Amino acid sequence: MPEIYGSWASRRENIATLGTLTSLAATDAVEVSGINFTFVHEVTGGNVTVVDEGSLDGDNWFSLDEEKAHTQSGVDAHFYPNRVVRFVRSRATAIGSGESVTISMACD
């Protein structure tokens, strides 16, 4: 985790692409300095469920909100205000064969 994303940086440096998931897995974690988060899920396919997670130590993870189920291809944004965490990541909890989700995150 070479960079810290958050409110102290210029706006364009507050955005990170966490990765593309094609199976039940988690993206790489990034360190953040902020309390307001926007996660963008760019879905290809129609059976993708993602949970966006936070952590205080990078080892123990918890959900920022409920799982987000996507039933068609497209782009969806999810907003999490007032979440105090040090690290964030996303995890696919259901994903069909040949489907994918690319996840980006912005924080402030």
Residue ranges and their predicted role:
Residues 1-13, 91:
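Extended, low-complexity segments enriched in Ser/Thr/Gly and acidic residues that occur primarily
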Residues 2, 91, 96-108:
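Edge beta-strands of jelly-roll/beta-sandwich modules across compartments, strongly enriched
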Residues 8, 34, 74-88, 104:
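Surface-exposed molecular-recognition determinants
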Residues 10, 63-72:
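Solvent-exposed serine/threonine-rich low-complexity stretches and specific carbohydrate-binding patches
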Residues 13-31, 44-49, 70-77, 95-99:
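Surface-exposed ligand/attachment interfaces on beta-rich extracellular proteins
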Residues 33-39, 82-99:
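Noncatalytic modules at the cell exterior or secretory-pathway interfaces
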Residues 43-44, 58-59:
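PLP-dependent class I/II
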Residues 53-55:
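Conserved Ser/Thr-centered positions that define the repeating blades of beta-propeller domains
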